[in-house]
Curated annotation (Swiss-Prot):
Protein name: Protein FixA
One Pfam family recorded for the sequence: ETF
Taxonomic placement: Bacteria, Pseudomonadati, Pseudomonadota, Gammaproteobacteria, Enterobacterales
BP GO annotations: carnitine metabolic process
A GO molecular-function descriptor: electron transfer activity
InterPro entries: ET-Flavoprotein_bsu_CS (IPR000049), ETF_a/b_N (IPR014730), ETF_b (IPR012255), ETF_beta_N (IPR033948), FixA (IPR023463), Rossmann-like_a/b/a_fold (IPR014729)
Keywords, comma-separated and alphabetical: Electron transport, Transport
Matching Gene3D superfamilies: HUPs (3.40.50.620)
Species in which this protein is naturally found: Escherichia coli O45:K1 (strain S88 / ExPEC)
């Protein structure tokens, strides 16, 4: 059983600065980290490994220079995967969901897999598209919002997901792609033994050419900016008479 767990390196949100002049975001001082939602996918994959005989877990990521960071690689491997594959290319530095999914699908085909796990979305964009797009590209079943994995056999994965007013149980034929929600588990903090052992695990570095990926016309991101902030007027209207109500209504009209 070959399980691939996908993850994304994202900027640490606490280090992102806002340029007051135009509202643009400054990522220059933000360190990269594993997307919080993908930590759940990594944990789920490693829990499945304990259930399936001879299962192997491969962590897979696509991106730019952030994936060259040795500390980041060690962090991923310390959480349980047996090996790591990173696909690094400058064109993937700010990849949007369609391109990311295309590269992940190509890399997964090259590596071989029975099951692909990923988080429902990423901590930065949270587009909630990549998992379903990977399934579409590979022409295999894809399910998102999975909150529980019930069982895994050689050819079927049984899962649950919470809908608005019911719990849905699904049996998914393998191979398949499953995007998990944060309800599925609580990611463990790696032990010192796991951290030290991570340095001995294999890491494969692939380029776009290695997976046969040709640059495609992708949607381009036009702008990422913080919302404009309005200065508060600090208008306080005291009382509940007709004059105060009229004044309140008049001020509402000015901002609507």
């Amino acid at each position: 059983m070959k399980i691939i767990t996908c993850y994304k390196c994202v900027p640490d949100e606490q280090d992102i600065a806002v340029n007051n002049a135009d509202g643009s975001l400054d990522f220059s001082k933000a360190d990269a980290k594993i997307s919080q939602y993908d930590l759940n996918a990594i944990e789920a994959a490693c829990q499945l490994k304990q259930q399936a005989a001879e299962a192997q877990v491969t962590a897979l990521s696509v991106g730019g220079k952030a994936l060259t960071n040795a500390k980041g690689r060690k962090d991923v491997l310390s959480r349980g995967p047996d090996e790591l594959i990173v696909v690094i290319d400058d064109q993937f530095e700010q990849a949007l969901p369609q391109q990311t999914a295309s590269v992940l699908a190509a890399a997964a085909q090259k590596a071989g897999f029975d099951l692909i796990l990923c988080g429902d979305g990423s901590s930065d964009l949270y587009a909630q598209q990549v998992g379903l797009l990977v399934g579409e590209i590979l022409n295999i079943p894809a399910v998102n919002g999975v909150s529980k994995i019930i069982s895994l056999t050689a050819d079927t994965l049984t899962v649950e997901r919470e809908l608005e007013d019911e719990t849905e149980t699904l049996s998914i034929p393998l191979p398949a792609v499953v995007a998990v929600s944060t309800d599925i588990n609580s990611p463990q903090i790696p032990s010192m033994k796991a951290i030290l052992g991570a340095a001995k695990k294999p890491v494969q570095v692939w380029s776009a050419a290695d997976i046969g990926f040709n640059a495609e016309a992708a949607w381009s991101e036009q702008q990422v900016a913080a919302p404009k902030q309005r200065e508060r007027q600090r208008i306080v209207i005291e009382g509940d008479g007709e004059e105060q109500i009229a004044a309140f209504a008049e001020n509402l009209r000015k901002v609507i």
